[in-house]
């Protein structure tokens, strides 16, 4: 959203930075190759705006309901296996309540769960779209009180914009997948109508089936009723 008073951004360097970060995130809706690429770029953009030593972008899994780290910077390589339930840890609390949280000193926070030694300060904000929490952006610092309330407010704005961008990219990817499936069905119907030779028809069926479900392999078996067995 454009600033009604552009001169105010010039007088306030922090406001100008805020607008630049929001614009960089918003532009990913049209420039990112896919949602996975956008996640990596979003985290890099956000981390560069704060004195953060590590950070992560975690998403709520529709299959397990858990909070799974999609991308991270500065954390141990095996942190991808580190999954939290909603309400568990600081990021889990943010995911469950859909509210940002700042912890100036993690040593005095009973909800804190360590993913990296040396972290002293942490803040997290929800990724959301259409009123639903999609995940959490989490930043860590090795200095006590490294993040302020103003930083948390900024992170909340960035995370909200990031959630909108990712939601749009996921919608586009679903539409593209549906379009590809429709194209495959049309091609399959055309093959049946043109009455291909049996060998060609079977080959078309397997190729179309593989493309339709984006599968690595598709096999078509012939059932022998007398022997009660399948033949490849």
What do these predicted regions represent?
Residues 43-47, 54-82, 207-210, 217-232:
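GAF sensory/regulatory domain recognition
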Residues 19-37, 41, 45, 183-200, ...:
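Short regulatory/linker helices and ligand/cofactor-binding micro-motifs at input modules
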Residues 156-164:
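Allosteric cytosolic regulatory segments
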Residues 75, 136-145:
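Short beta-strand-to-loop transition segments that serve as allosteric relay/switch motifs
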